[in-house]
Swiss-Prot record:
GO terms for biological process: protein quality control for misfolded or incompletely synthesized proteins. It catalyses: Hydrolysis of proteins to small peptides in the presence of ATP and magnesium. alpha-casein is the usual test substrate. In the absence of ATP, only oligopeptides shorter than five residues are hydrolyzed (such as succinyl-Leu-Tyr-|-NHMec, and Leu-Tyr-Leu-|-Tyr-Trp, in which cleavage of the -Tyr-|-Leu- and -Tyr-|-Trp bonds also occurs). The active site is at S109, H134. It comes from Bdellovibrio bacteriovorus (strain ATCC 15356 / DSM 50701 / NCIMB 9529 / HD100). GO terms for molecular function: ATP-dependent peptidase activity; ATPase binding; serine-type endopeptidase activity. PANTHER family: ATP-DEPENDENT CLP PROTEASE PROTEOLYTIC SUBUNIT, ATP-DEPENDENT CLP PROTEASE PROTEOLYTIC SUBUNIT, MITOCHONDRIAL. It is found in: Cytoplasm. This is ATP-dependent Clp protease proteolytic subunit. It is an enzyme of class 3 (hydrolase).
Length: 212
């Protein structure tokens, strides 16, 4: 007897909708589109090419909408693709708008770099977050191929490590050697330690206390 395939359950992300009353009647928005009206972008997943493209598109839209108003980027991310993260980073520096960053939950790896890359004085964290910095990882469970190709990838990884360290150096004020030592292994910090290290500017508990 041939077993019949059973339908598999797939996780579906539930996206809330909000309804606003306008002069023309009711208008429905998914929550992320509604937040975008208030210049809020949410990075709540691992950093992938698709996520980067979406965030970059939102930043460009908000820059065109009003280049004088800041963009608010909320981050809860374990990190992800270095190239995708650097694409977001480059556009954070490219757009005319200030970019305020907010850590909620966790900002690890590329997530911490994006948190730190916010406009100086506008990098926030809630009090119970975790921030983690480390050197870039070689993706995949193993490495195979010609020795020459392995050497090429190893050299590229070293260049990437130096590039990321230099970016942290630019935004934290820490010297290169201190950062290199701090990033040698997974380095977890609470937000107060991250503030002391220069990764963020303010630890906030409520909107009533923006500076802490």
């Amino acid at each position: 007897m041939t077993p019949q395939s059973q339908p598999q359950e797939t996780a579906v992300a539930l996206i809330p909708y909000v309804i606003e009353q306008t002069s023309k009647g009711e208008r429905s928005y998914d929550i992320y589109s509604r937040l975008l009206k208030d210049r809020i972008i949410i990075l709540g997943t691992a950093v992938t090419d698709e996520v980067a493209n979406s965030i970059i598109a939102q930043m460009l839209f908000l820059e065109v909408d009003n280049p004088e108003k800041p963009i608010h980027l909320y981050i809860n991310s374990p990190g992800g693709s270095v190239s995708a993260g650097l694409a977001i980073y480059d556009f954070m520096q490219f757009v005319k708008c200030d970019v305020a960053t907010y850590c909620m939950g966790m900002a690890a790896s590329m997530g911490s770099l994006l948190l730190t890359a916010g406009t100086k004085g506008m990098r926030y964290s809630l009090p119970n977050t975790r921030i983690m910095i480390h050197q870039p990882l070689l993706s995949g469970g193993g490495l195979s191929g010609q020795v020459t190709d392995i050497e090429i990838h190893a050299k590229e990884l070293v260049k990437t490590k130096e590039k990321l360290t230099r970016i942290y150096e630019t935004h934290t004020g820490r010297d290169y050697d201190t950062l290199r030592a701090a990033m040698e292994r997974d380095n977890f910090m609470d937000p107060y330690q991250a503030k002391e290290f220069g990764l963020l500017d303010h630890v906030v508990e409520s909107r009533k206390a923006k500076k802490g």
